[in-house]
């Protein structure tokens, strides 16, 4: 089973996303990636955030757990404690090949929470909805569990 750890960082009414252009598709995802052997999902989330955005964060709490076929994705609400946005050093940047459409490009970006409902290309939609609703409703008391199956 593949385990991923992803982060939700909100500051000044904006959320950090990774803008992706891949194989002629344009979409946004939350920063994150695979959990390495011997690593907890929390440790992976912190590492991935720094690799992909250049920001150092601390975990506040788990927001969601998404089960999708043979993978589990953990989404954590985080708080920034340092770093420089856009200075990520992950292989997405150091080994990027803009001429390879299968690999695509990664662009760390900020998006206003109020704009999230206008975009149908922010994934996963369940986490985007949680972030957008946090403005008025706050965060759920317990992590949201989502189970999806391939159709």
Spell out what each predicted region is.
Residues 35-58, 67-123, 149-151:
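Unchanged
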């Amino acid at each position: 089973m593949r385990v991923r750890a992803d982060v939700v960082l909100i500051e000044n009414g904006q959320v950090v996303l990774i803008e992706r252009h891949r194989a002629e598709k344009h979409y946004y995802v939350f920063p994150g990636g695979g959990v390495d052997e011997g690593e907890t999902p929390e440790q992976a989330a912190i590492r991935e955030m720094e690799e992909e955005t250049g920001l150092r964060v601390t975990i506040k709490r788990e927001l969601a757990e998404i089960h999708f076929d043979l993978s589990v994705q953990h989404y954590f609400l985080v708080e920034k404690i340092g770093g420089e946005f856009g200075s990520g050093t992950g292989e997405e940047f150091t080994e990027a090949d803009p001429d390879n459409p299968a690999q695509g490009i990664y662009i760390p970006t900020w998006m206003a929470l109020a704009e999230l409902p206008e975009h149908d290309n922010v994934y996963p939609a369940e986490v985007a909805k949680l972030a957008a609703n946090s403005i008025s409703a706050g965060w759920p008391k317990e992590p949201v569990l989502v189970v999806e199956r391939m159709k």
